[in-house]
UniProtKB/Swiss-Prot annotation:
Function: DNA repair enzyme involved in the repair of deaminated bases. Selectively cleaves double-stranded DNA at the second phosphodiester bond 3' to a deoxyinosine leaving behind the intact lesion on the nicked DNA.
Taxonomic source organism: Salmonella typhimurium (strain LT2 / SGSC1412 / ATCC 700720)
GO molecular function, one term: magnesium ion binding
Enzyme Commission number, as recorded: 3.1.21.7
GO cellular component term, pick one: cytoplasm
Name of the molecule in the record: Endonuclease V
InterPro entries per the UniProt record, alphabetical: Endonuclease-V
Positions of Mg(2+) binding: D35, D103
Keyword DNA repair annotated: yes
Length: 223
């Protein structure tokens, strides 16, 4: 594995990320969610894509793709491991979203190219990274109240907002992926909350990928 080459690719791609608001449709008619997981001891990469109507946030379509994993787990290089399955799921959607939430980092990455940014560049869609853990940077400790907020800073640059979306839950790291500003990323996530820790697009993507009860109930209603 030539990590030096991958690192150089990340730096080059990161220079093409658009950190300004460039939505083709604002407000969006459809918002997507993406989540990646692994099966069979990491041998298979599974990606789930969901499509929600906006502003109702009603689930209208989902796709799951499973492909052979082509790269081992290497911190800082996860997007190279995850994007092939994401692309396979994306290509199955009959309707593409106007805005995509990705479970993972955007520019809040040591080389400013998390999976939300990498995938956003690949398909040229506005993306937001919604991560559950810090990858780089520092932030001031948050109060326990829901809504507590702090900028994630690295080398004098704001990479994300750290936001406690729900009481007694760890905060989310919300960042530009591509074609969405940092402040707008936070605002869009806040518009897509329904009382859970995660915004609806990535919550549904996780539910579909993992076969959670909410998704099972949704399937039963559709029959």
């Amino acid at each position: 594995m030539d990590l030096a080459s991958l690192r150089a690719q990340q730096i080059e791609l990161a220079s093409s990320v658009c950190r300004e608001d460039r939505l083709d449709k604002d407000p969006p008619a459809f918002i997507g969610g993406a989540d990646v997981g692994f099966e069979q001891g990491g041998e298979v990469t599974r990606a789930a894509m969901v499509l929600l109507k906006y502003p109702s946030l009603e689930l209208v379509e989902y796709k799951v793709a499973r492909i052979a994993t082509t790269m081992p787990y290497i911190p800082g290089f996860l997007s190279f491991r995850e994007y092939p399955a994401l692309l396979a799921a994306w290509e199955q959607l009959s309707q593409k979203p106007d805005l995509l939430f990705v479970d993972g980092h955007g520019i809040s990455h040591p080389r400013r190219l998390g999976v939300a940014s990498h995938f956003g560049l690949l398909v040229d869609v506005p993306t937001i990274g919604v991560a559950k853990k810090r990858l780089c940077g520092k932030f001031e400790p948050l109060s326990a109240e829901p809504g507590a907020l702090s900028p994630l800073m690295d080398k004098g640059e704001q990479l994300a907002w750290v936001w406690r979306s729900k009481a007694r839950c760890n905060p989310l790291f919300i960042a530009t992926g591509h074609r969405v500003s940092t402040d707008s990323a936070l605002a869009w996530v806040q518009r897509c909350m329904k009382g859970y820790r995660l915004p609806e697009p990535t919550r549904w993507a996780d539910a579909v990928a993992s076969g959670r009860p909410a998704f099972v109930r949704w399937q039963e209603i559709q029959r």
